[in-house]
Curated annotation (Swiss-Prot):
It catalyses: L-phenylalanine(in) + H(+)(in) = L-phenylalanine(out) + H(+)(out); L-tryptophan(in) + H(+)(in) = L-tryptophan(out) + H(+)(out); L-tyrosine(in) + H(+)(in) = L-tyrosine(out) + H(+)(out). It comes from Escherichia coli O6:H1 (strain CFT073 / ATCC 700928 / UPEC). This is Aromatic amino acid transport protein AroP. The keyword Cell membrane applies. Residues 1-18, 63-85, 138-154, 222-239, 292-332, 379-398, 446-456 are cytoplasmic. GO terms for cellular component: plasma membrane. The gene is aroP. It comes from the Bacteria. Residues 40-41, 107-116, 176-200, 261-270, 354-357, 420-424 are periplasmic. The keyword Transport applies.
Length: 456
């Protein structure tokens, strides 16, 4: 598989270290750096428990996807499994849903990049920075998969070092007495208890917490280009979860011990507050580099992910055939360009449209992710049933099957209910049936076209 091939094969150019950090980088993004502030305000120190619960659900989903991917490492990942074990509409819907999800995320991250650049150069409009990084990252992804893996590896390294530095520095402030009189582990329970707003405060935040873990399923997408999927996928799946729990739970435990949670404001990153102790300008610049890297890293993953998903859809016959080709370096150029074109349109819409349109798009991301994870779990149940009937013993079985699947599905349902009760998020839940109808129409059109072609 390692040779230069032309036609319809992706090149296996990703090593285990790339796959580990692609998943880790996908999960350490804006959610941890900025999103945790509003959760802390609502849930207090209980956010730590929230991340543990969401981390467990994410791990179950990753293991379900991991089991399928180790057996059949193909491009298109779970849309392939939904297609093969559940039915052609399920494959069509899950693939396109995932593609749209990451186009929306890509657009959001590019906008964030523009805002971060303004920290240094306020006179540069956001759309200019977004356009520059849009061109650079897409150009890099057009070279070959190894370059993508290498770039994502270093992006993720920067984020990981920043979080580790924060944990070490925070722990030093805490235990050396240099953190001031307010720094004490008792902050975790002194200010109105571990769950100051009761369990309700935590439950209402589970939707936002869950989306910090979105991106973990990137491990499944990398399978077709992994050097040795039978070994690297189980390893990446099992190790990533420990690391994420250390990064999320570790950093938040240190953060919330350093000062009372009541001092966290929704419009500032909690990380800015803690690094503030180092002295203003150095910290502000260092942190801005980190959040900029985080946004670029997630956008980089989006470009990779979208092109591979579209490639998989084309191979299944769910997208135009021209998208199922790769160049002599094994890069799916057409799918990268098509995904880029749509993302560029989003940047334009984002530039022209008021903030409300952008808020709505982000709420759609939330719903698309729920559909995505639920479909992984459902496709896995069908996959396991089929394998049991064939008498096949899988090499990397998921945890707690089938109970684990039902736990995940109940969790997704609960998240949707929570979103219905959350102002600004409810609209995206109402749009789920509309989106499914659009997918249904697209599927019928595809079937009709395929029949017409056969008739000729």
């Amino acid at each position: 598989m390692e040779g230069q091939q032309h036609g319809e094969q992706l090149k296996r150019g990703l090593k285990n270290r790339h796959i580990q950090l692609i998943a880790l980088g996908g999960a350490i993004g804006t959610g941890l750096f900025l999103g945790s502030a509003s959760v802390i305000q609502s849930a207090g120190p209980g956010i730590i428990l929230g991340y543990a619960i969401a981390g467990f659900i994410a791990f179950l989903i990753m293991r379900q996807l991991g089991e399928m991917v180790v057996e059949e490492p193909v491009a298109g990942s779970f849309s392939h499994f939904a297609y093969k074990y559940w039915g052609s509409f399920a494959g069509f819907a899950s693939g396109w849903n995932y593609w749209v999800l990451y186009v929306l995320v890509a657009m959001a991250e590019l906008t964030a990049v523009g805002k971060y650049i303004q920290f240094w150069y306020p006179e540069i409009p956001t759309w200019v920075s977004a356009a520059v990084f849009f061109v650079v990252i897409n150009a890099i992804n057009l070279t070959n998969v190894k370059v993508f893996g290498e770039m994502e590896f270093w992006f993720a390294i920067i984020k990981v070092i920043a979080v580790v530095a924060m944990i070490i520095f925070g722990a030093w402030l805490l235990f050396s007495g240099n953190g001031g009189p307010q720094a004490s582990v008792s902050n975790l329970w002194d200010q109105g208890g571990f769950l100051p707003h009761g369990f309700t405060g935590l439950v209402m935040m589970m939707a936002i917490i869950m989306f910090s873990f979105g991106g973990l399923e990137l491990v499944g997408i990398t399978a077709a280009e992994a050097d040795n999927p039978e070994q690297s996928i189980p390893k990446a799946t099992n190790q990533v979860i420990y690391r994420i729990l250390i990064f999320y739970i570790g950093s938040l435990a240190v953060l919330l011990s350093l000062m009372p949670w009541t001092r966290v404001t929704a419009d500032t990153s909690p990380f800015v507050l803690i690094f503030h102790e180092l002295g203003d300008t150095f910290v502000a610049n260092a942190l801005n580099i980190v959040v900029l890297t985080a946004a670029l890293s997630v956008y980089n993953s989006c470009v990779y992910c979208n092109s591979r998903m579209l490639f998989g859809l084309a191979q299944q016959g769910n997208a135009p055939k021209a998208l199922a080709s790769v160049d002599k370096r094994g890069v799916p150029v057409n799918t990268i360009l098509v995904s880029a074109l749509v993302t560029a349109l989003c940047v334009l819409i984002n530039y022209l449209a008021p903030e409300s349109a952008f808020g709505l798009l982000m709420a759609l991301v939330v719903s698309a992710l729920v559909i995505n994870w639920a479909m992984i779990s459902l496709a896995h149940m069908k996959f396991r049933r089929a394998k049991q009937e064939q008498g096949v013993v899988t090499r990397f079985p998921a945890l707690l099957y089938p109970l684990g699947n039902w736990i995940c599905l109940l969790f997704m349902a609960a998240v949707l209910v929570i979103m219905l009760m959350t102002p600004g998020m409810a609209i995206s839940v109402y749009l789920i049936p509309v989106w499914l109808i659009v997918l249904g129409i697209g599927y019928l059109f595809k079937e009709k076209t395929a029949k017409a072609v056969k008739a000729h």
